[in-house]
Amino acid sequence: MRIELATIQDVPELQELQHKAFGPQCIELGWKDAPPMTESLEHAYEEFSQCTTLKILDDEGRIIGSIRGNVTDGSLYMGRLMVLPEYRQQGIGKQLFREIQRLLPHNRAWLCTCKQVPAPYEFYLREGFRPYKDEIVGPGQTWVYMEKKIRERL
């Protein structure tokens, strides 16, 4: 397995990964209209152009995980950390999560995650992120905003 920068040609495969990674949970929770499930290919291309996206490939060159990030005023936003279900619990998400932070210089990192899905929330806590805001976005849907401030090195 290897981590690489994704290219614009990867967008259709990344969108397929997104459906496979988030689809089962969205369906289970009754969120058929959740953004990861309803995003058009055109919008996916737009989003791609505004972020740095990393992908992790299996030995056959298939994308099995991804994350995207964008730094504004020293603040790194990370989103869409996703791994194919059959590759979870192998440290792939952790590798991507740490690599995007290493790659993009920042003094604060932030993200949002769904409060109703505990595994990602618990992972982010273990990685040193702390909640700072909740937002109800729909029936049974609450986003938790989390951040991690980076100390300046002396």
Model regions: which residues?
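Conserved acetyl-CoA-binding loop-helix of GNAT-fold acetyltransferases
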Residues: 83, 89-102, 122, 126
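Short glycine/proline-centered loop/turn elements that form peptide/ligand docking sites
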Residues: 97, 116-120, 136-143
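Conserved acetyl-CoA-binding loop of GNAT-fold acetyltransferases
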Residues: 125-134
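Conserved GNAT-fold acetyl-CoA-binding loop/helix
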Residues: 16-44
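Conserved GNAT acetyl-CoA-binding A-motif
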Residues: 103-115
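A short beta-loop-alpha structural element at the N-terminal edge
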Residues: 2-16
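A short helix-loop-beta-strand connector motif used in the catalytic cores of GNAT acetyltransferases and
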Residues: 43-55, 77
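Conserved beta-strand in the GNAT
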Residues: 55, 62-70, 77-82
